Each structure stands twice: as structure tokens, then as C-alpha cells.
């Protein structure tokens, strides 16, 4: 008799994806972040669902409903902080996951990579709208500044912004629709993640060498299930340390002040995970130019397969490319730091140099380094 997990229509799908899946024998801990992202998404959906039971998306009561969750709802404070810091963990895993893809050339799986970039945009949109919901000062002004960027689009810009706002400023209509979108998008993300996995399982996983591993596969269970469980335990350890010891470490104190359209905070800035893109936006003195650079800073990932000039897939055996990759990481950390600083000397020039460096590294230096390596290896 066939095992039920191999014959049952539903169990068969789970079996082929998580149990009998042939996986390369040499994938490192950098391959753990996919499963961690899945866990993050589940945590966010569950905590978000419980928050939505007590939250009201009205400008008059939104701020006090969040206060009510923290003070009066049973374990409301832990649910709220798990959701807020869960977003930070989500983005840490996302950046690691994308970085792994860049380093080991995983972007050569075109469909998987493109769905991944769409997922990245969707998660960023969800996080942005979620930040608006508590209706604190930074929520309101962040929403005002970021939505206003669309007014840089020629001809239709102003109409588009007012259409998104549902009025002539960020107000009740904006908050209600942001809540609606923030609620529905995670389920769309979950569906996209399924498609992401579907395409991945068509080709099988990449591995650190970038060489085909068809002749050396091992079953996903028990080897990688146990490895993923270790990753999940470490993720929960870090998340709960944040939540229970320093829940406001990554937040902005301004968001504990209720939104006031008549009073602008001295430094408007988004959450830490958007600071690198915000720094690129601010480094260009022209509004439309800044918006284009902001979009391109993420959209550039789509073009990675076209910019791959090396005869090797992975960077494992390419010291020049490795060096440039880590310079890119340092550059992104610099941009993140600059994004949180006020617009004054010397931060302006540092931000501009780091922004130029970001695009130069990806568009020019890394493809050239790959060609140099090809020549050095006489390929």
C-alpha cells in the first residue's frame, strides 16, 4: 500500500515540497532565510489578525485604540510589539535572502527571482501602510511625505495623490483604505510566496558552488527540516529578546505623539528598513529624479540577470566580485545611517556619494569585475 503522504492529493503537494524534496547536500545557513520568511509571515498574519480585532481605523480613535490594546487587552502589549518588531525581523530576513541570491547567482532562476522582486515590493508596501495605522506623528507625516512623492509624476501626479488620499490631505479616508490594504496584502503575499516556491521547485535549489547538484541530492526531511527548526528557534529568540527587553528600540519616539496636521516633526523619517531607499531619494535635489532613483534602487534587482557577465554563477570562486559585493553591503549600511540623519553638511554629500556608489557598483563595477575574472581564468 502506498504511503498516504504520497497518494493523498493534498498531502502529496506538502510531501513534494517539504518532505521528499531532493535538496543539494551542501546548502549553507544562508538557505535558511526562505523558511524564516515563511515563519515571519505566519507570525505577522496571526498577530495582525488579533490586533485587527481591537483596532479602529478612524482618525479620532485609531491612536487611542492602539493605547487600549497595550493597556487593557489581555497580552495586547506583547501582540502589538511582536507585530511591530516582527516587521523588523521580516526585513532582516528579506535583506539576507536577497543578499544570498545576489552572492550565489540565484537570480538566474528568472521566474523565481522576478516573483521574489514583486514580493519585495509588496512587503514594502504592506509595511509602509502598517506604519500609518497607529496614527502617531510619524505615521501621519510619513504617509503625507511618501504619498506626496507621486505628485512628481508629470500631468497626472496631483490627481493621483488626491485619489489615493481620498481628499485633499491625508485624513480619515486615507487611514481607512490603508487599513483595508494592510489587511488584504499579507494574504496576497502568502499566495505569491506559494508561486515563488512553485517556480523554485521546477528547477530545484541553487547551492554555494553554483554548479548543478543533480548527482548529489538528499531528502529535505529530516536534514533540512531540523536545520530550519534551529533557524526558527534563533529567529524567535532574537524577536522575543527585542519584544521583551527593548520593544521600542527600532521605533520612533515621535509616534507616541498623536497625529497633528498643524505640527511637523523636526525630522521626518521612515522605519529603519526603508532608510537606505530614503537616503537615495533625498540625495537627488530634483523631486522627479529622486522618486525615479528611489524606485530604481529596488527595481534594479530585476536587471541582475542581464548584468551577470561572469562565466561562473556563484561568487564563491570570484575574489574580485566578492570584494565588490561586501563594499555594496557597506554602502547600503552607510545609506541606512545617512537616511536617519538630518539634511545638513556633511550628511548631504556622504549620502550623495553613497547613492552614486550604489548604482556604480551594481551597473558598472560588478559586471566589469566579472569580465576581468573571466579573462584572468582565460575563459
Curated annotation (Swiss-Prot):
Protein name listed in UniProt: Cytochrome b
Keyword Electron transport: yes
Entry's family note: Belongs to the cytochrome b family.
Positions bound to heme b b566: 97, 196
Keyword hit for Heme: yes
Residue numbers binding heme b b562: 83, 182
A molecular function (GO) term: ubiquinol-cytochrome-c reductase activity
Pfam families: Cytochrom_B_C, Cytochrome_B
Entry's localization field: Mitochondrion inner membrane
Topological relation to the membrane, as annotated: Multi-pass membrane protein
One GO cellular component term: respiratory chain complex III
GO biological-process terms attached to the record: mitochondrial electron transport, ubiquinol to cytochrome c
Cofactor(s) it depends on: heme b
Subunit composition and interactions: The cytochrome bc1 complex contains 11 subunits: 3 respiratory subunits (MT-CYB, CYC1 and UQCRFS1), 2 core proteins (UQCRC1 and UQCRC2) and 6 low-molecular weight proteins (UQCRH/QCR6, UQCRB/QCR7, UQCRQ/QCR8, UQCR10/QCR9, UQCR11/QCR10 and a cleavage product of UQCRFS1). This cytochrome bc1 complex then forms a dimer.
Amino acid at each position: 500500500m502506498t504511503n498516504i503522504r504520497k497518494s493523498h492529493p493534498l498531502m502529496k503537494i506538502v510531501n513534494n515540497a517539504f518532505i521528499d524534496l531532493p535538496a543539494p547536500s551542501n546548502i549553507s545557513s544562508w538557505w535558511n532565510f526562505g523558511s524564516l520568511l515563511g515563519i515571519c509571515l505566519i507570525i505577522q498574519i496571526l498577530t495582525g489578525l488579533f490586533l485587527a480585532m481591537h483596532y479602529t481605523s478612524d482618525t479620532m480613535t485609531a491612536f487611542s485604540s492602539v493605547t487600549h490594546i497595550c493597556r487593557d487587552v489581555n497580552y495586547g502589549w506583547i501582540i502589538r510589539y511582536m507585530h511591530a518588531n516582527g516587521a523588523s525581523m521580516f526585513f532582516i530576513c528579506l535583506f539576507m535572502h536577497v543578499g544570498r541570491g545576489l552572492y550565489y547567482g540565484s537570480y538566474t532562476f528568472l521566474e523565481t527571482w522576478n516573483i521574489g522582486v514583486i514580493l519585495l515590493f509588496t512587503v514594502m508596501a504592506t509595511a509602509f501602510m502598517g506604519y500609518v495605522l497607529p496614527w502617531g506623528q510619524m505615521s501621519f507625516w510619513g504617509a503625507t511625505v511618501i504619498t506626496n512623492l507621486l505628485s512628481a509624476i508629470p500631468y497626472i501626479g496631483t490627481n493621483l495623490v488626491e485619489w489615493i488620499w481620498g481628499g485633499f490631505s491625508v485624513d480619515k479616508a486615507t487611514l481607512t483604505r490603508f487599513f483595508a490594504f494592510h489587511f488584504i496584502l499579507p494574504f496576497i503575499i502568502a499566495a505569491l510566496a506559494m508561486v515563488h516556491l512553485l517556480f523554485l521547485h521546477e528547477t530545484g535549489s541553487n547551492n554555494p558552488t553554483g554548479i548543478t547538484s543533480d548527482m548529489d541530492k538528499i531528502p529535505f526531511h529530516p536534514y533540512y527540516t531540523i536545520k530550519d527548526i534551529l533557524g526558527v528557534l534563533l529567529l524567535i529568540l532574537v524577536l522575543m529578546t527585542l519584544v521583551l527587553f527593548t520593544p521600542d528600540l527600532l521605533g520612533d519616539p515621535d509616534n507616541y505623539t498623536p497625529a497633528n496636521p498643524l505640527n511637523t516633526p523636526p525630522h521626518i523619517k521612515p522605519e529603519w528598513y526603508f532608510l537606505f531607499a530614503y537616503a537615495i531619494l533625498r540625495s537627488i535635489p530634483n523631486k522627479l529624479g529622486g522618486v525615479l532613483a528611489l524606485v530604481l534602487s529596488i527595481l534594479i534587482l530585476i536587471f541582475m540577470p542581464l548584468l551577470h557577465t561572469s562565466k561562473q554563477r556563484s561568487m564563491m570562486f570570484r575574489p574580485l566580485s566578492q570584494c565588490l559585493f561586501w563594499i555594496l553591503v557597506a554602502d547600503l549600511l552607510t545609506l541606512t545611517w545617512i537616511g536617519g540623519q538630518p539634511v545638513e553638511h556633511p550628511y548631504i554629500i556622504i549620502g550623495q556619494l553613497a547613492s552614486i556608489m550604489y548604482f556604480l557598483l551594481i551597473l558598472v563595477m560588478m559586471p566589469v569585475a566579472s569580465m576581468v575574472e573571466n579573462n584572468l581564468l582565460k575563459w
